[in-house]
From Swiss-Prot:
Keywords tagged on the record: Ribonucleoprotein, Ribosomal protein, RNA-binding, rRNA-binding
Assembly: Part of the 30S ribosomal subunit. Forms a tight complex with proteins S10 and S14.
Pfam family, one: Ribosomal_S3_C
Organism: Mycoplasmoides gallisepticum (strain R(low / passage 15 / clone 2)) (Mycoplasma gallisepticum)
Chain spans, region Disordered: 224-263
PANTHER family assigned: 30S/40S RIBOSOMAL PROTEIN S3, SMALL RIBOSOMAL SUBUNIT PROTEIN US3C
InterPro entries in alphabetical order: KH_dom, KH_dom-like_a/b, KH_dom_type_2, KH_sf_prok-type, Ribosomal_S3_C_sf, Ribosomal_uS3_bac-typ, Ribosomal_uS3_C, Ribosomal_uS3_CS
GO BP field: translation
Cysteines paired by S-S bonds: none
Molecular-function GO term, any one: mRNA binding
HAMAP family (UniProt xref): Ribosomal_uS3_B
Function description: Binds the lower part of the 30S subunit head. Binds mRNA in the 70S ribosome, positioning it for translation.
GO annotations of cellular component type: cytosolic small ribosomal subunit
Name of the gene: rpsC
Name of the protein described by the UniProt record: Small ribosomal subunit protein uS3
Amino acid sequence: MGQKVNSNGLRFGINKNWQSRWVAKTNQQTGDWIVQDEKIRNYLFKKFHSAFISNVDIERTQTSIRVFIYASQPGIILGKEAANIKVILLAINKIVGRHIKVDVDVLEVGNPSLSAKIVARELADAIENRTPLRTAMRQALKRVLKAGAKGIKVLVSGRLNGVEIARDKMYIEGNVTLSTLRTDIDYALEEAQMSYGVIGVKVWINRGEIFGKDFYKKQAHIVKPKGSEANHQRRNSNKSKDYRDNKNKQFNKNHQNQQPAKE
């Protein structure tokens, strides 16, 4: 199953968080919001192509929307003195409506070489610039493994090098276990627009396995109220103390009943 489906979609809710996080009131609103989210992502990826955007997360309420943009080069998105933010806000308002409050956060990707979206985009750009395919793929594999990845798989398909018959070319380095759900697999698909047709680029990156507490931390960030943990520990300590007192009372009572009567 892991070989057939989108590796990101298979892990949503397990070790990946959803990229659109909201709850709609009606089915009609659900459909409208899905279309709006797709329009927002298409606009950002197209306008800021050179910023190498990794992913765009969207959080909504009925009256507001917050967009998180993760990019390798956030300075290109922000512009001089954050002038581009106003342009982005106006564009998103046109999509979702003027009555919706819009917030935009631009975040820098810590290690771009471990983002499948960025690696696939760089490889597609190299193909568009007429870089030899084998050289571009080997450079991408070497860069990702050097960044600390456990494994990488790259699949390029189409009229490679302009040949008449389309074919596939795949490189695999390291361990890429697509069926193991605890494995943090990042997947992305990009396209290289050539004069003789479109070449598809697929990238899978194994960023290691997630165990124990980290396995659940990847799902969502849970914010606890102040003092909740201390109160929880205090309640547990009181419960254990009451339990020990009851046990001691029961033991003393049974011990007294078992003592032989004095003559």
